[in-house]
Amino acid sequence: MPKYLTIYHQLAQRIQEGTLPADMKLPSETELMHEFEASRGTVRKAIDALQEKGFVRKHQGKGVFVLSQEAIEFQFNG
């Protein structure tokens, strides 16, 4: 499995479990690089995948924020 998918799955699981609650800012790319021992490009690819699936939203200059699970469920069921 590609490294970015491993990061994606771990972060998605944290969001679903509430470890990373709605409106919380994700750790910085640098922090995630150190935590997962991955390159910046790999971390960005994982974050892009999270955004594509509706787990997070990027706010330029502010960071990446977790979306509410209700919004995610509505996106896929509504």
Model-identified regions with their sequence ranges:
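HTH-adjacent hinge/linker in prokaryotic transcriptional regulators
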Residues: 3-7, 17, 21, 34-35, ...
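A short alpha-helical element within helix-turn-helix/winged-helix DNA-binding domains
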Residues: 25-36
